[in-house]
């Protein structure tokens, strides 16, 4: 069998394009490799946000959405848009799983607990959805409505939760029942790297009201956290309970509705509510009726309000049907993105698909190791290219995104420089074997490290376009106005393969 000349797609997570060089870690880092590629290779900019990826207009892109669109080869209607629409249409209020959980609790005079990332960020959740859930519980007769707020500060400015908390305090005052019952930073409640000690802090807060601090209002609890030097993301377990109020710890028979729609950071805390769990010793394990807003994992046996819509003939599935071999490779932080999300929410590997996982470094925050595990990832990537085994290789480098999220500018520059060296080695390997390479990103981040409006650090994604660069021996000229969902049809075209009818994206090569 002759050695294959692979077509590789390298996704530089969080690597957007911004003309303004102020606080732009990508523009200011020393990047001889990327500079040379942009000067000498076919390249263009493509859209990775808003309506172009199935998000609301102007909404910044994110990794889940980006990889889903890239892999699908069509614009995929995102959960955020789907759920917002269902609320406006009145469908949300009739959703079977939600109705059943709330009505069962009401009938037994039990509490309805609503938990989720309390933020207008729109990446993992949206506070408008949480508001609709609170109103629905109240309308269906729930008297005890407890809201457990996971605070953001990552997809939103680092200290921006007060407006959201005030909004819910006002809502409960208007309803005359229910309250904000707890606060904790997403660092604890939404870990995705098996740091079970962090998750346990959130679990104990929910199930035992075990907290480091207690305050009589959510806004007061937040102010105290800021006094202690904690930004939203890192707020310690805080119980919100005024004199004479009963504990809001979850009890047998209560309903629990988890209002995050994005799976990767919702899985771990959700698994703590399943009988078969070994992450840590649970001091309390209330028998609650738990509803996931969307399916967080196929093996979690809990009710789902919005089951996944299946995608037929994604890039990975289509390659498999053509008898092609493919490799998916990344670090822990983005492994789910190049596998599960890229495959349209399918956990299992397709025939001919292999996966390689490189462990992300075990550091508290990635500014402490901005190169992350790029050296090892690149070694494996180069070996895969030269192995002659794969028709296609999909690789994600997380650095620009994960270090961009820390808000530490110097570290972001170092991350970009580490990436540049890695890309150089990948380019050399591709040229050596006569393969083809597309370099792109799933959304922006590190190109804006300071918020131009406030002058504060900017830790969130951006709505800016991302690069698309071609390396290979074909005479390629790109069309303008492309988007992420055009990548799969473009890759199939470059590989000389037929494009399935389901892929409505355009081929970006003229």
UniProtKB/Swiss-Prot annotation:
Recorded family membership: Belongs to the BPG-independent phosphoglycerate mutase family.
User: What does the record give as its pathway?
Assistant: Carbohydrate degradation; glycolysis; pyruvate from D-glyceraldehyde 3-phosphate: step 3/5
What CDD domains is this protein classified in?
iPGM
The active site consists of: 63
Keywords for this protein: Glycolysis, Isomerase, Manganese, Metal-binding
Q: Which residues form the signal peptide?
A: none
Which cofactor is recorded for it? Mn(2+)
Give a short account of what the protein does.
Answer: Catalyzes the interconversion of 2-phosphoglycerate and 3-phosphoglycerate.
Q: Name one GO biological process term.
A: glycolytic process
User: How cofactor binds (record note)?
Assistant: Binds 2 manganese ions per subunit.
Please give the superkingdom of this protein's source.
Answer: Bacteria
Task: Extract one GO cellular component term from the record.
Answer: cytosol
Task: List ligand-binding residues for Mn(2+) 2.
Answer: 13, 63, 442-443
Q: Where does Mn(2+) 1 bind?
A: 401, 405, 461
Q: What is its EC number?
A: 5.4.2.12
- Species of provenance: Vibrio vulnificus (strain YJ016)
An example molecular function term from Gene Ontology annotations? phosphoglycerate mutase activity
Official protein name in the record: 2,3-bisphosphoglycerate-independent phosphoglycerate mutase
Subunit structure, as described in the record: Monomer.
Kindly list the positions annotated as binding substrate: 124, 154-155, 186, 192, 262-265, 334
As its record notes, the protein acts as a catalyst of:
(2R)-2-phosphoglycerate = (2R)-3-phosphoglycerate
- Report the InterPro entries cross-referenced here: Alkaline_phosphatase_core_sf, BPG-indep_PGM_N, Metalloenzyme, PGAM_B_sf, Pgm_bpd_ind
The keyword Manganese appears for this protein: yes
